[in-house]
Amino acid sequence: TKNILPDRDIDCVVYGCTSGTIAAGYNSIEQKIKVAKPMADVTTPSTAAIKALKKLNINKVCLFTPYSKKLNDEVLEYFKSEDFEITSNAYFDIEADYDIGKVDQNYLYDVLSKIDLNGAEALFVSCTALPILPIIDKLEKKLNTTVLSSNQVLIWDTLVKINKNNSVEGFGKLFQSN
C-alpha cells in the first residue's frame, strides 16, 4: 500500500479479492493498509457484500462461486458466520484465477439463469475475477431477484465511502437503492 501514490492522500483503498479477504481476515488487511494510508477508508469484496445484503434487508442468499470445493466451502462458511441463511450453493470448481477470468459471459449467464433460487431473496456471485458485472441487469430481469457480485458490491461500497453514491443505471438493483 505504501507504493500507491506515496505522497498523496487517498480516500479509499480497495482490496480486490473476495476469497483472499476471507482467508486473511478484514482486520489484518485493514491494519496493513492503515500503516501506509492511515486516513483512508478500506473496503473488500467480502465486507462490501455483507454491507450490501444488510442494506437491502436480505437474509436468505443463494451463493455461487467459481472456486474449488475447498475455497467455495470457506466462502459459504463466511456468509453463515455473518448470520446469512444460504438457501443453495453451486460452484464451478476452477482452481486458477486466470481461468476464472476467462469464463464466457454467455456461459455464465446460462448457468446462473438455471440456478436454484428456491427460498432465496438474492443471488450472490463471488470472485472479482469472474466477468459477471455486464450481465447483472439481464440476470436480475431473468431471475426476478436481486443479483449481487463481488465487483458490483465493491464498487458500490467504494462510492458510498467517498460520498459519490448517486444511482447508477445498468448495474443492478443495488445501485438503485442509494
What are the roles of these predicted feature ranges?
Residues 1-178:
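Non-catalytic structural scaffold of enzyme domains
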